[in-house]
């Protein structure tokens, strides 16, 4: 996908929604929507809110797939049990949906879970992190680098 300046308004709507909710962190689906609207290809994805919906939508996305917890409290999802890789079939989707939500709640009991992101798994892909902030001296700053469990290693 090529960047189209007319998509700037769509990005601004997502950012305003995040800001209006009082969050400083975008949910996984929101951040990936911003990346996609910026002209960068992302794997097929959908945010689901029940195991039944997860089963139905997983068949549309295809396998293997990844599940990621969607919660503003999930900055490091992997460490909190909020990521499952390599899901191969519908039965596993149902089992893992229950497991990922209960494991995450076990790690962060007061967390509000907005849903679970189902995403097509890309074999041998590199995990990336993208972030942004407004620095008083430099203005808007974008951070881009290796993501996943390596984020803390290089911090």
Annotated model-derived regions:
Residues 1-155:
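ATP-dependent carboxylate/acyl-activation modules
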């Amino acid at each position: 996908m090529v960047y189209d300046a007319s998509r700037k308004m769509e990005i601004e709507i997502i950012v305003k929604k995040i800001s209006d909710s009082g969050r400083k962190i975008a949910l996984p689906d929101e951040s990936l929507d911003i990346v996609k609207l910026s002209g960068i290809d992302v794997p097929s994805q959908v945010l689901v809110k029940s195991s039944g919906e997860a089963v139905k939508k997983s068949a549309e996305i295809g396998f293997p797939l990844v599940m990621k917890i969607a919660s503003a409290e999930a900055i490091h999802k992997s460490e909190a049990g909020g990521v499952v890789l390599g899901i191969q079939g519908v039965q596993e989707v149902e089992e893992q949906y229950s497991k990922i939500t209960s494991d995450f709640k076990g790690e962060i009991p007061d967390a509000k879970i907005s849903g679970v992101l189902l995403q097509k798994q890309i074999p041998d892909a590199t995990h990336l992190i993208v972030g942004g902030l407004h620095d008083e001296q430099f203005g808007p700053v974008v951070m881009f680098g290796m993501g996943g469990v390596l984020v803390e290693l290089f911090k």
